[in-house]
Amino acid sequence: MKKAVVVFSGGQDSTTCLVQALKEFDEVHAITFDYGQRHKLEIEVAQKIAKDLGVKAHKVMDVGLLNELAISSLTRDDIPVSHELQENGLPNSFVPGRNILFLTLAGIYAYQIGADTVITGVCETDFSGYPDCRDDFVKSMNTALVKGMDRALTIKTPLMWLNKAETWALADQYNALQLVRENTLTCYNGIIGDGCGDCPSCDLRKAGLDEYLNNKDAVMKSLVQKQESEGL
């Protein structure tokens, strides 16, 4: 039996990955992390989507310690989300160590349930500049987990080389475009669906959706070519 664990936030990217995983694996578990993020609604959204899609199990883990250590606009209500980069070249929404912790815990969970695949929706094409969304980081984490647990494990990143328009096309491939558009929470200001339309996350999401809806055939063709050439 093929089992997978999906790192699941209830946002556009992880929901698209979850929809795909449910088609490709016999048993799918979702894992969501409560790290004291700005909007607790994220967790409620993730729980509802996971239930509606019928995952085998949905685990919500309390990792509040991350909030104490990582100062970010996503972990502090008094820090407004900014479109400007900080002096270190990163947006102030970057939560240092977040994906290191998430992938480690997802790997441990996969070990316990006998799953050999962890799926995450990180992306290096259209992304916010987070270093822990890059392909070389994920590969390094994969190596560390395999060596540290002495067990075969693959971290799968279906969106790594897709732009946002192609990510929308992927959701549409699985007849889930409206599900993703209407029910996910990607907005940094905590508005479900199309969001506030003003934060960096909403800007990226809307630009990708507009590009896909205005050029469906071309974007879908590009997606299929990447799937065939890169095994996405």
From Swiss-Prot:
CDD domains: QueC-like (cd01995). The keyword Disulfide bond does not apply. Pfam families: QueC. The keyword Secreted does not apply. GO terms for biological process: queuosine biosynthetic process. ATP binds at F8, S9, G10, G11, Q12, D13, S14, T15, T16, C17, L18. Binds 1 zinc ion per subunit. Its EC number is 6.3.4.20. GO terms for molecular function: ATP binding; ligase activity, forming carbon-nitrogen bonds; zinc ion binding. It catalyses: 7-carboxy-7-deazaguanine + NH4(+) + ATP = 7-cyano-7-deazaguanine + ADP + phosphate + H2O + H(+). Zn(2+) binds at C187, C196, C199, C202. Pathway: Purine metabolism; 7-cyano-7-deazaguanine biosynthesis. It is an enzyme of class 6 (ligase). It comes from the Bacteria. Keywords: ATP-binding, Ligase, Metal-binding, Nucleotide-binding, Queuosine biosynthesis, Zinc. SUPFAM superfamilies: Adenine nucleotide alpha hydrolases-like. Its cofactor is Zn(2+). Belongs to the QueC family. Catalyzes the ATP-dependent conversion of 7-carboxy-7-deazaguanine (CDG) to 7-cyano-7-deazaguanine (preQ(0)). This is 7-cyano-7-deazaguanine synthase. It comes from Vibrio parahaemolyticus serotype O3:K6 (strain RIMD 2210633).
